[in-house]
Amino acid sequence: YYGENGYKEICKRPDIDLVYIATDWAHHFPVAKEAMTNGKHAAIEVPSAMNMHEIWELINLSEKTRLHCIMLENCCYDFFELNSLHMAQEGLFGDVIYAQGAYRHELSPFWKHYWKNGPNDKLGWRLRYNKEFRGDVYATHGLGPIAQVLNIHRGDRMRTLIAMDTRSFNGKKQAEKYSGEPCDTFRNGDQTTTLIRTEQGKVMEIIHNVMTPQPYNRMYQLTGTKGFANKYPVEGYAVSAKDMKEAGVTPSNDDLSGHDYLKEADMKALVERYTSPIVKKYGDEAKEVGGHGGMDFIMDSRLVYCLQNGLPLDMDVYDLAEWCCLAELGSISMDNGFMPVEVPDFTRGHWNEVKGYKHAYAAPEDEAKALAEAKAFTAQLKAKGAKYWAAADKKATKKKGKK
């Protein structure tokens, strides 16, 4: 399969259950729509939808077909995020009232590597998208992990957002560098900040900056009534000795107040106490296999695990909608004097029915059965593939002999 429309033939195949979509942003939606229309689950790279029309189309199609539509947000599966989520779920931080996330990653060394649509396309698809669209166009790496901590559409929901940006300084220069022409309009500001207030009176702050020099940073900061977590630039936790003891962890001294980060020994003890079950199951293998430090492996493993065991996926189509909507809604806010914008309830009134975000797990006996069936199926596929390649090699050898 090849070419811009090859995916349509793939989606028609009866032997495929899920279509894994890792294209440029413009093709995420049409491929996902084609997949679900043809009875396939859709797993879509980030961001899965770029505007409200695409978001509602995916929701409607997923609900109509009863098929999974998941956004492949790998940053929800990094080790610090998984362990911190587990701590928050166990109440270590109290109520998390303010959470920050970001995508701060200067892309100037990479703009030239994004594919170009023909000889007249000098910018490449990603720089061109930033030139044409305002708002946080890549919010999900920062928003996804903190939305899980705040139980979004599982007891709380995003209610109102306000977005503000700088004007384009470096973005404009990058466009001029690659196009060789003056750039009068570059819509995306060098830095965009979005504030979101939830129904339960909590606040999320999301930052997007791919234009100015700075170390890679997804922020991931949780401010709770009893504790604090911070990933960038240095991983750390701040909790009191009293709360550590109540959690069953012996502090190095009784003077810990939460005013400073825990020392290495205390942090290690805390992480050992609250290591996520997912990290325990996949962590060692993830580090060995790699893929953004192992989080890609964990994400794909959880996706397959949930599908094999008939469980709800870790991220659903409503997560996709909430995490992607900042692009257009933020643009609306900024284009109208940085005014507050209401965030739709993508669940259509069901945001408070599930109490708390949770990962789903199968019973041990069911998990073992599903794993055995999967291994047997994989063995059959490998045998079939080996037979095919043996025949192909034999044919190639025979053809070579005739020459």
Where are these regions (language model features)?
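Active-site beta-strand termini and strand-to-loop segments that position acidic
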Residues: 194-200, 224
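C-terminal helical cap and adjacent loop that interface with cofactors, partners, or active-site loops
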Residues: 147, 215-223, 230-233, 240-403
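Hydrophobic, small-residue-rich alpha-helical packing segments that form membrane-like cores
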Residues: 36, 50-54, 77
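Predominantly a Rossmann-like dinucleotide-binding segment in NAD(P)-dependent oxidoreductases
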Residues: 65-68, 75-186
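ADP-ribose/adenylate-binding Rossmann-like module
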Residues: 39-51
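N-terminal glycine-/serine-/threonine-rich beta1-alpha1-beta2 phosphate-ribose binding loop
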Residues: 1-40, 56, 60-68, 375-403
